[in-house]
Amino acid sequence: MSQVNKGEGAAGRVAGVIVSHGQVANELLSAAETIIGSFKHITAVSIGWHDDVEAAKNEIRRAVERVSEGGGVLLMTDMFGGTPTNIASMFLQQGAVEVVTGVNLPMVIKLAGLQPGVPLEEAARLVRDQGRQGIYLAGELLAGGGRKG
């Protein structure tokens, strides 16, 4: 893979690539843009059930290069242990590319709203934490029993 600009000391924004099975990635991106407006630093790669691994890897590589703004790239995948995560993990590069699994809509919105200059590692933690905080058992919450998070 060609080198991605490292986020250390860079004023660039952390960019993102949502990678998923089926059309989940495209739909998450579309939903986020409907809620907060369009943005250019996050894109989606949907891996079809019968897609070739090398072709998927090349598509992710192109997406990373397309959105990179100098602050690193966060690959957000749908499920730990799945093909999208396994392929995305090939791109891990300290300070330049990180992978967070279990992507949901609050995570995409969080990344979209981060300001330039936030280091990649911090952005990854903030996005992960936002995803966790967005998970509730609605029945418990409505019954006053708290939340899962």
Which functions belong to the PLM regions below?
Residues M1-G149:
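N-terminal loops that bind phosphate or other acidic moieties
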